[in-house]
């Protein structure tokens, strides 16, 4: 092995990559150790006596090669939101950013009115008539007046006021 080329075996090979673009098969990685002939030790990218650049840290760094995967996108599939939705006429249309955000927020579906009359709000606070948090001594009946059987959603302020003591 020449001086200045320690830990550089295998970096000249190209084309030996797996399906994700990672190098495979006999590629050894250097550690960026001592470089003879320069009078210095260690360091990334220092030139040896013969002009070989040192790669430190034991990491493979390809020189601006693009790895194509044949047009196949590898996705995790963990997200449930889609960038398009049914347009009602058998086709699809792209969703806007606003629609994507509304889809992820709890209770943000204005088109879905089927669950509001039976289950209450987003966190089930609508039908409770008993004593609220930390309010001992109150007998129920004073908390959900006005929205009990109408199927209307309570506003955020109404929910907060309901939980405050002495505000009825």
From Swiss-Prot:
GO terms for cellular component: vesicle membrane. InterPro entries: Dehydrin, Dehydrin_CS. Sequence repeats lie at residues 2-10, 94-107, 122-130, 132-140, 153-166. Residues 2-140 are annotated as: 3 X approximate repeats. Residues 1-154 are annotated as: Disordered. Phosphorylated on serines in the serine-cluster region (poly-Ser). Residues 98-114 have a biased composition (Basic and acidic residues). Induction: By abscisic acid (ABA) and water stress. Residues 115-147 have a biased composition (Low complexity). Keywords: Phosphoprotein, Repeat, Stress response. GO terms for biological process: cold acclimation; response to abscisic acid; response to water deprivation. Belongs to the plant dehydrin family. This is Dehydrin DHN1.
